[in-house]
Amino acid sequence: MAQYRVGRLEQEIQREVTDILLKRVRDPRVEGVTVTGVEVTGDLQQATIYYSILSDKASSAEKTAAGLKKATGLIRSELGSRLSIYKTPELTFEQDGSVRYGSRIDELLNDLHHQD
């Protein structure tokens, strides 16, 4: 039962954070950020939000991370007003490398296909 609740909360946080980033956060450093997943601890006290960006540049990734860190307070307070839970979890943002990894695999497969 607890895992079911955690799963629902993860989906709800992902949906709400995506909406908040699109509509409430005005920082240009976080434009183009896609929330790819959320992991919430079993006690619902901490949430790790995984995101991806379209740019491959390291400087862009650093700027995005700084923008998200700066906006964490706003995002958490908005989540608190939108979610019906006792305590809003602490938020941490981590860049999701799986999108970049997947595109690299696609490039390698295309190269192999063109060599044949």
Curated annotation (Swiss-Prot):
MF (Gene Ontology): ribosomal small subunit binding
Keywords: Cytoplasm, Ribosome biogenesis
Function: One of several proteins that assist in the late maturation steps of the functional core of the 30S ribosomal subunit. Associates with free 30S ribosomal subunits (but not with 30S subunits that are part of 70S ribosomes or polysomes). Required for efficient processing of 16S rRNA. May interact with the 5'-terminal helix region of 16S rRNA.
Family: Belongs to the RbfA family.
One BP term from GO: maturation of SSU-rRNA
SUPFAM superfamilies per UniProt: Ribosome-binding factor A, RbfA
PANTHER family assigned to the protein according to its UniProt record, in alphabetical order: RIBOSOME-BINDING FACTOR A, CHLOROPLASTIC-RELATED
Pfam family, one: RBFA
GO cellular component, one term: cytosol
Stated name of the protein: Ribosome-binding factor A
Subunit structure as annotated in this protein's UniProt entry: Monomer. Binds 30S ribosomal subunits, but not 50S ribosomal subunits or 70S ribosomes.
Cell location: Cytoplasm
Superkingdom in the source lineage: Bacteria
